[in-house]
UniProtKB/Swiss-Prot annotation:
Pfam family, one: Aminotran_3
Family membership: Belongs to the class-III pyridoxal-phosphate-dependent aminotransferase family. HemL subfamily.
GO molecular function: glutamate-1-semialdehyde 2,1-aminomutase activity; pyridoxal phosphate binding; transaminase activity
One Gene Ontology term, aspect cellular component: cytoplasm
UniProt xrefs under SUPFAM superfamilies: PLP-dependent transferases
Residues the record lists as N6-(pyridoxal phosphate)lysine modifications: K268
Protein name in UniProt: Glutamate-1-semialdehyde 2,1-aminomutase
Keywords, comma-separated and alphabetical: Cytoplasm, Isomerase, Porphyrin biosynthesis, Pyridoxal phosphate
Organism listed in the record: Methanococcus maripaludis (strain C7 / ATCC BAA-1331)
Signal sequence annotation: none
InterPro entries referenced in this protein's UniProt entry, alphabetically: 4pyrrol_synth_GluAld_NH2Trfase, Aminotrans_3, Aminotrans_3_PPA_site, PyrdxlP-dep_Trfase, PyrdxlP-dep_Trfase_major, PyrdxlP-dep_Trfase_small
EC number: 5.4.3.8
Catalysed reactions, as listed in the record: (S)-4-amino-5-oxopentanoate = 5-aminolevulinate
Length: 427
């Protein structure tokens, strides 16, 4: 498909990139046909590509940039830290400062282990749960994405689903034989799997809001049900809040829904645009990590001073006003999407929570992975391309979600709604 915008330089760079980088990208979610645009710079809620195009950004690097791109406070703090060093290999005070902030915000957090990504965080949390319970099996939900590691890369969402590989080759069957898959929002399926695997399940890991298969919300009472059934059966409940952490509220999904998990993983927003992840939870579990316990977890860049500095500066700015404003922006866009789809008789379902939203081109309610997969992905890509031609960038997949930042102002929202109207009319 040829886009009706100037992308000559991006085309050149993509052709060169394909010679050196697999598929021309470093993560499959960044790939779309005929080729992705190449960014030269970013500021506030805008991306500027190598051809001079300006795009309003609702992808926000897949979530982290809640304060907008190139935030001056974060940049100044990071520059000051870089003058003091970029990696130490020994502890620094800032690690304590950020850990305290995490503990003050996240309901289940009593101790923290910083890592370098959401993938590392979920991998470590699952290992911890298995070590603590001395059980091997885990429950994950169909379509949930918990990073690109072998324990959970089965029937997953995000780029794996977009590019047709929800079950990755290269993972031995023995690795995933202990990964039990069930549909999201299905209480009976949870009860059945637990009863069939009595005293064998170490943990249930879930995205409280499934943000890697669009935006699938938990049914009323579902998270409370999971909390109760895990407690009854000695199963550790892990909330993967890499997306929802610090986005739904100060305390993430746990605070937003009033449910306290045993362990939680966070990332994205926590790093303010720099690589980071964290495992957090009950002290009695967390202290089983080495050096206090026998469960090994380590990393050269764990608690990296640059990432930690950016995290401290980011969390300083996430107050009640921030959440009220970013939620309002997502509410406005979600309402407009519903109204415009109805106006042009486009079958669609729109879901939003706090500053997360997504549209599915489907006439059925989306409550599971299978529901999401039944959506019209070809229509979604036509919608995506028309938005792009009109200066709006969203993730190029039906199975990702959109985000608002504090920098999406009224003028930006108006331009976005104009682009949405054009896109819906063309469908």
């Amino acid at each position: 498909m040829e886009l009706n915008i100037k992308m000559d330089r991006s085309r050149e760079l993509f052709e060169e990139s394909r010679k050196y980088l697999v598929g021309g990208v470093n993560s499959p979610v960044r790939s779309f046909k005929p080729f992705p645009f190449f960014v030269k710079s970013a500021k506030d809620c805008f991306l500027y590509d190598e051809d001079g195009n300006e795009f309003i950004d609702y992808c926000l690097a897949y979530g982290p940039m809640v304060l907008g791109h190139a935030n001056e406070n974060i940049l100044n703090a990071v520059k000051s830290q870089m003058d003091l060093g970029t990696a130490y290999g020994v502890p620094s005070e800032k690690e304590i400062i950020l850990a305290k902030e995490v503990i003050n915000r996240i309901p289940c957090a009593e101790m923290v282990r910083f890592v370098n990504s959401g993938t590392e965080a979920t991998m470590g949390a699952i290992r911890l749960a298995r070590g603590v319970t001395k059980r091997n099996k885990i429950i994950k939900f169909e379509g949930a994405f918990h990073g690109a590691h072998d324990y959970v890369l089965v029937k997953t969402g995000s780029g794996a689903l977009t590019h047709g590989a929800p079950n990755s080759p290269g993972i031995p069957e023995d690795t995933t034989k202990n990964t039990l898959l069930i549909p999201f929002n299905d209480e009976d399926a949870v009860k059945k799997v637990i009863s069939e695997n009595k005293d064998e399940i170490a943990c249930i890991i879930l995205e409280p809001v499934m943000g890697n298969v669009g935006c699938i919300l938990p049914k009323d009472g579902y998270l409370q049900f999971l909390r109760e059934i895990t407690e009854e059966n000695g199963i550790i409940l892990i909330f993967d809040e890499v997306i929802t952490g610090f986005r739904l509220s100060k305390g993430g999904a746990q605070e937003y829904y009033g449910i306290k998990s045993d362990l939680a993983t966070v990332g994205k927003i926590l790093g303010g645009g720099f690589p980071i992840g964290a495992i957090t939870g009950k002290k009695e579990y967390m202290e089983q990590f080495s050096p206090n316990g026998q469960i090994y977890q380590a990393g050269t860049f764990n608690g990296n001073p640059v990432s930690v500095t950016a995290g401290i500066e980011t969390l300083k700015n996430l107050d009640d006003k921030f959440y009220k404003e970013t939620t309002k922006k997502a509410d406005i866009l979600s309402s407009f999407l519903r109204e415009t789809a109805e106006k042009y008789n486009v079958p669609a379902k729109v879901y939003n929570v706090a500053s997360i939203f997504q549209i599915y081109f489907n006439d059925k309610e989306i409550v599971t992975y299978e529901d999401a997969k039944s959506s019209d992905t070809e229509k979604f890509m036509r919608y995506f391309y028309t938005l792009l031609e009109n200066g709006v960038f969203i993730a190029p997949s039906q199975f990702e979600c959109c985000f608002t930042s504090i920098k999406h102002n009224d003028e930006v929202l108006e331009k976005t709604m104009n682009a949405i109207d054009i896109a819906m009319k063309k469908l």
